[in-house]
From Swiss-Prot:
Signal peptide: none annotated. Homotetramer. Forms heterodimers with either ThiH or ThiS. It comes from Paracidovorax citrulli (strain AAC00-1) (Acidovorax citrulli). Residues 245-269 are annotated as: Disordered. This is Thiazole synthase. 1-deoxy-D-xylulose 5-phosphate binds at residues 166, 192-193, 214-215. GO terms for biological process: thiamine diphosphate biosynthetic process. Disulfide bonds: none annotated. Keywords: Cytoplasm, Schiff base, Thiamine biosynthesis, Transferase. Its EC number is 2.8.1.10. GO terms for molecular function: thiazole synthase activity. Pathway: Cofactor biosynthesis; thiamine diphosphate biosynthesis.
Amino acid sequence: MPDTASDDALVLYGQRFASRLLLGTARYPSPSVLEAAVRRARPAMVTASLRRQGSNPAEAGSGFWELLRRLDVPVLPNTAGCHSIQEAVTTAQMAREVFGTPWIKLELIGDDYTLQPDTLNLVEAASQLVRDGFHVLPYCTEDLVLCQRLVDVGCQAVMPWAAPIGTGRGPVNPYALRTLRERLDVPLLVDAGLGLPSHACQVMEWGYDGVLLNTAVALAQDPVAMAGAFADAVQAGRTARQAGAMSAQDAAQPSTPVLGTPFWHHDHG
């Protein structure tokens, strides 16, 4: 949620947020569960798509939009389901009119099986939206060159995946994700592929600025409890990063220093 005081706020496009967790709103078993999960997680933003099919009772009809307003959490519209630059740009423009916000999570799908982003067209779509005044948060792979190009065209934050959407596998390419953190100075948020709170904690320990979740919470046996677990994990990972973890060692080192000879070994004769 928006933050005005915290010294460790998440800052995106000049706006401060108290939470470093962003939460998706799809696939929850009911509107009441969705509402309770959002209230438990207290996310910075919740994502929503204009291209809803209405097959899920938690997502169908005007009640869903009423729920979003009632939650009083900033909405991050997305372009889910778009396969072309023009489709994504048009959807973003419609979302700006509906929600009255310049924020957009840019999704441009290149493969329907893996839901992998169309990296060839993603940069051009982002460039057009940035020029049109949008605060673009692009969903992308962990490819360093792609992410750098997105920054070059004006994206002030980038959202690489940990694994394909909905797989819950956690970070499948830790080396690439850590390289991104070392090379890019903009905020980085992991979007997609996290399945466990420990996954979220791990990427936060690597120095990521936040995470965006949906399926891992919505499809949990207890989505509300899982929302809270992820919120706690994100904060724990952030705190650990700031605290500065010890370096891994190859050899064992005693945690209690031993000085001199134990008293029971002294010669009392």
